[in-house]
Amino acid sequence: MEKPYIVGVGGANLDICGRAGGQILERDSNIGSIHLSSGGVCRNICENAVRMGADVKLISAVGADANGEILLQRCKAVGLDTDCVFKLQGYRTGAYLSVHGPDGDMVNAINDMDIMQALTPELLARCDRVLRDAAVIAVDANLPPETLRWLCVSYGADKPIFADTVSCAKAPRLLPVLPYLHTIKPNLMEAQLLSGGESPEDCAAALLEKGARNVCISAGSRGVYYRNREEGFWVHPYPLEDVANATGAGDSLMGGLLAGFAAGMPVRERVRFAVTASVLTIQSADTIRRDLSRQLILDSEKECILP
């Protein structure tokens, strides 16, 4: 019998990061370093969950190009199932290009995610059996609104669906499907936008009124506020003196929520597990911590999370 698995549906792309070696000169070629890595919110969430011991299948799309091959190879190398990642003619593999100054601060960026529009209900219907047999489904707000609705209507009654808001620009796509979602994970700015509230507590209460069932709000160094219809609670991390890279905190948090759910963890244990994963991640220079594992998270919880 196949082990219960997670299905992630959403963005997968290559991240191309350039960092100047000195002060950036506009309209000129600047000497520096260029780093290529795998990215995309849903793909990153899925890789985190794999590193935490979960079986995960990714549903996404890449172009029939060299970047698509690189991305698929890198996904497979970490154990992520890509059988339902479609290679599409006429599309470019999604890419995110950022330029940073010598201090690491971003100067500018361009994202090319047009391929996400190709993830239509008709295309995803080819993965019906994979979706129906999943223990839990994760989606991100990179998906077109009609695809989000189709997924939620088709599978939300029988399968728990976890949703990542991605950004303030894309988070509103989730409002019409809130009642179908098991869990929504916004950061505080996204929660304020969706709810009209100010504090995490007020935002979560308002989202419950709008139909949400479980709300997990990441509030930066304060930690995470979790609320459902039975209870609400905070999980606070110990203060950190050094943050190496906060970029991957949200993706590891969501990966932890999913891996914990798939493993049958009770809600409070699941949230503490996820927050510990997030704390460990921001102590690494990499967006996805390379040595992240279920055992490392379990061993580190008491050092990372306040009682």
Residue ranges of model-derived segments:
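Glycine-rich phosphate/adenosyl-contacting loop at the front of the ribokinase-like
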Residues: 1-80, 236, 243
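Conserved phosphate-binding/catalytic region of the ribokinase-like
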Residues: 1-7, 30, 200-307
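Gly/Ala-rich phosphate-binding loop of Rossmann-like dinucleotide-binding domains
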Residues: 50, 156, 262
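A glycine-rich helix N-cap at a beta->alpha junction
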Residues: 77-90
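Conserved phosphate-binding/catalytic loop of the ribokinase/pfkB sugar-kinase fold
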Residues: 87-88, 98-136, 141
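Short beta-strand scaffold segments in enzyme catalytic cores
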Residues: 95-99, 108, 223-227
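Conserved phosphate/ATP/ADP-binding segment of small-molecule kinases
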Residues: 156-234
